[in-house]
């Protein structure tokens, strides 16, 4: 944790420095920073060449060293960074200012280097945030919030629960944005998305976050489409120390955290441990949460050429949600204001309520714990080659609540339907009437009409990434490696509460076919009386096995850098069902898909420095990706209930290219890039609600062969004219649109194919399977702001004090289009038009921090105010029939003003 702990100087260093005071002829000082992130580097060894004198940089990266001679050489060294030497010929006191250290290209360092890129050298569009920037910006929000000022990135909080954030990049949704921790993928192996609630604890252990937009430079075998987010956790500290943090904020937000490090011992051992707890009531009504996080890193320098590191981290959590499908219409939000305090109507939660015993009830609780264990071996084979191997294990436990009901009450758990507040079980005060459900079930002579179940998802995931690096000569480097993954996800749905009924009869049991399950179809099977702990609706395992190789050649000479890279992988996918199939028919066929990537790029740094001390830089990259379809909605169209393989599943094809320019001086940096991405044969799902036998049911439309184009311009800049002031800004202009007219097939909420009346069928894509052609060519893609801008500054008016302000602007957000009940038919056609453009909005965030000494310990008091002006704005919406505000549905408003304060004591 180089950037977090206050490191006390050892007695030896103090005595050496003290003994030299009398004879010192010069005092040299400065601040050592990471060349990639501009963050201070803690624990860097600063030594006088030819003498035993050395000191270490403090928590701010600063050092002071005394030399008996005016002419001397200072050497800077730290694990994972290239050593730097500065010559000095100064009498008296001299300040070197900022001294950048670059990450080592071949050295004992973290596994994350296989996915990190270097600014002004790697030919990709990237943004890197260090630990200090993360701490300054995050406040009480989820970790992705700090990326909001990154070009091309759009953050959504969806229903607004803890960790329910979604990240879109260049218009691509979360399942097409790779999220990595220390170079290891976190994306779900079945559908590609990321549940940030599983990784909320990373806020406290992240040393940097790097976003690579577009193709990126990650050396892995399974690439992303929109870009990648690589979170680098803090390494085992070189010096001992610790920190304690307490934070609090609005709506009962509390946070406790601690960190301890033994420092590196004489025999090469080091241990770092961190932990914390976060809890609160939530900004949205009825979204209270409890979360814990832990982090452990143990390293051992086996020799000067071998480093072994074990890392474990996790973030168990319990949080209540507001369903992502329970957004209302604009008018509907005004109407529910009568249930809330003045000005708080947008916090309303349609499924928050009480039972008949006066106890708080929810139908959207999520409980999960997904720890990850990593064992890394770094081997410096010789001066020009190294082998970096990380093996990892991830185990997931938990799930989310899922209301079940008989056919007539199948949709009664919904808080809203197509943006209209559900009233069947609604109290006069607007709360959901859980007590009425209990009363109905208790009076029923045929068991519970509605019960609560838990959709359990148990994951077991093992993998290995190994990268060999070879420096051929001073111009050529070669990389090559293996990327292996094996995953099994067990998905069940177990009854947790009968809601005062005697038993429950699962309506999905009648869909089990006798030819697949011996004994199915009988009255005893279909009408089996179930109780708490029994399985309903689904019970299956999803298997994904990936094996891949990757390679990259780099050329770096004078001012030219170029690379050519490729990867090849095989993805095997199959499922094993215990609900709709007996043991003899349980396992599906195994589907293998080959994917590959070819990409290359060039970066040229102009050799001459202009009159302002600036350097010009240009880059370009181009690539082609063939990616295997996902398990869910791709290989298996009804992945929750059927072993039937999609006969039309094909690889997605992505072509992408971009060019960029940057200008860099000691105080100013500007980056400009334009990109063009063509995406073909995408599989995509849309949710809608249709009437089925007098009830409203949620259904899914799986579309195949969807094509789109994403292109745009991105600009980011930073300016630091003086030590007391820094300025930053960004602009992103996108043009994201659909380019063809695909066909979609309809499935019910259990994943079963349905006919035009909403009744389940035996076979996907059969003659009676309801389908529809989507005429959407040239229609704007929805779900992300296609124009974003930002401007921010930090002011340092006095020693230890920082005040920061950020303005963010979002425009050209088109509502996601949806399909209504009138659209479903056996072979219909739906023509789409440009969806409603949500009103543009701007937000202002304020942050401040003051560092001082308290009882001899370095202490930082910091605070954040998010949405300082309490701006009212729409952050998410779906298009309606009129393509305007009055017909838009599933609308969510963004959070109002949020405040937090934090005290951190380092020791």
Regions found by a protein language model. Name each.
Residues 241, 248-279, 284-323, 331, ...:
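Transmembrane beta-barrel wall of Gram-negative outer-membrane proteins
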Residues 299, 307-376, 401-454, 517-530, ...:
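Acidic/polar loop-and-plug regions of large Gram-negative outer-membrane beta-barrel proteins
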Residues 556-559, 676-678, 697, 701-819, ...:
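Gram-negative outer-membrane beta-barrel transporters
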Residues 572-579, 590, 604-657, 669, ...:
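Surface-exposed extracellular loop regions of Gram-negative outer-membrane beta-barrel proteins
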